[in-house]
Amino acid sequence: VTTGLRERKKLATRRALHEAALRLVAERGLDAVSVDDIADRANVSPRTFFNYFSGKDDAVLGLDPDTSPRQVAAFLARPRDETPVQALRAVARAQAAEMATDTELWPLRLKVIDSHPALLARLAAVFGEGERVLAAAVAERTGTRAGADAYPTLLAGVAGVAMRTALHRWFAGDFTAALPDLLDEAWDLLSAGLPAPPR
């Protein structure tokens, strides 16, 4: 089996497990769904489930451990003549565009998260860890120190807030707006120094 085929099979299995978990929780609620239920719906063994996710919450959220490394690599690969803000904004916009192509699962994911505070807490923890990893990449690109200097942590945090704001607005607007455009609006406001809205 070629590496490419093996990777595609792994991605397909991960997606099948995520989709099964998400749909089951949407139907029954988080507490009424077990790992066995998810594995059964996805036609895999519970043992296989744990090769992909540490538990049902992570399966429902579809957490992919490669997301942060991919973002960091994309950020560090951006042209050096871009400012760190421009580079991070471009990476975030590409991510939003990719998310928006999943017109079925992303809206369902956000609806399920909205109904289950435990999932929201888990997602917040994942976002926090992602921002720490991103701050280290910003520090590497700018010659600053993550944790000691404000810039890398602040820029990574601002990127996270911009994405969360866009996702909240996408959800509140029943997914009718374009997610990348909502993200652009957030970055535009931040870049302008958050001027007060006209009365």
Residue ranges and their predicted role:
Residues 1-28, 32-41:
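Basic, helix-initiating cap at the start of DNA-binding domains
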Residues 4, 28-30, 43, 50-61:
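HTH DNA-binding helix-turn interface
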Residues 13, 67, 92, 126-130, ...:
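Hydrophobic/aromatic residues within well-ordered alpha-helical segments
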Residues 25, 34-35, 56-67, 85-88, ...:
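Amphipathic alpha-helical segments enriched in hydrophobic/aromatic and basic residues
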Residues 37-40, 49, 88:
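Append "Primarily bacterial transcriptional regulators
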Residues 69-109:
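Hydrophobic alpha-helical connector segments
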Residues 117-142, 150-157, 165:
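Amphipathic alpha-helical packing segments from all-alpha helical-bundle domains
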Residues 141-187:
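Hydrophobic/aromatic-rich alpha-helical bundle segments in the mid-to-C-terminal region
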